[in-house]
Amino acid sequence: MALEKIIRESLTGFLQCHIAHADLSALDEVFCAYVTGVLEELGSQNSSEEDFEMESFVEMLEGYIPGFSEISSEKVYDMLFELSGRLSEARGTENVSPNPTVEVSFMTPASPSEKTATEPLEGAVAQDKDDPKTGVDLLLEIFPSCTITQAQTALSMAKGDLEDAVQIIVDGKVIADNHSGSKDMQGAPKIEDLKDFILQKYMLVDTEDDKKTYRPVAPKEAPKKMIRYIDNQVVSTKGERYKDIKKPESEEMKKTYINLKPARKYKFH
């Protein structure tokens, strides 16, 4: 992670200096892995400037960052060799691990309390290197329905490789833990009991509404439009103030009407 951070910071500064509006969102893990491989080749003892393929490197970075091909190859060379030197120094500092307790042991004998204090620390360091709990926790985060025993068996089948363990669980090669499932099913309440409990506690039943009879309200009839004057003349001369006048209907419309009155009974003599 420290090496990737160094690469990301140096490339970000280099691009911001030479490309004003550079889109740095493409600097992902794949890009950093490619640049790391190129820098490892440059940092090797057998490599030289003639062996390095600058054109392919520029084409690759042009695909990630538009405008990279406009930067001169000399500046790119200087940046790459400087960055490879920084990475080699960072690797050297990581590989060298100081051990002050050994130097003190030559000068003064360690007390038993110091021994007991250093022993758990050494054990913790050894445990951090190969700690299966971290892999189990990651598997449980990825697969919440997976049990601890299933995650442990998947890690043991994958020999500690997390990606293989994930693939094993996805393929269903891990046998389900029937004992734990049966215990959970025995302790879990039934679905019908849960439904009754929820309905009894939270449902509001309006019993009075069931007793009422529904009587729909009759639609309101529009009042008839009464007319008093037509063409500035009184409609009726019988003393009515207003009168309802029906619109004249055509003969075709009258033919469509049906007479529902019973026919007259004629008596024949």
UniProtKB/Swiss-Prot annotation:
Report keywords, A-Z. Answer: Cytoplasm, Nucleus, Phosphoprotein, Ubl conjugation pathway
Q: Pinpoint the CUE domain residues.
A: 131-174
An annotated GO cellular component of this protein is: cytoplasm
Q: Where in the cell is it found?
A: Cytoplasm; Nucleus
Q: Which domain of life is it from?
A: Eukaryota
Question: Which parts of this chain are annotated as the region Disordered?
Answer: 110-130
Modified after translation how? Phosphorylated.
Main location per the UniProt record: cytoplasm
- Cited function: May play a role in targeting proteins for ubiquitination and subsequent proteasomal degradation.
Q: Which protein family is named in the record? A: Belongs to the CUEDC2 family.
- Protein name, entry field: CUE domain-containing protein 2-B
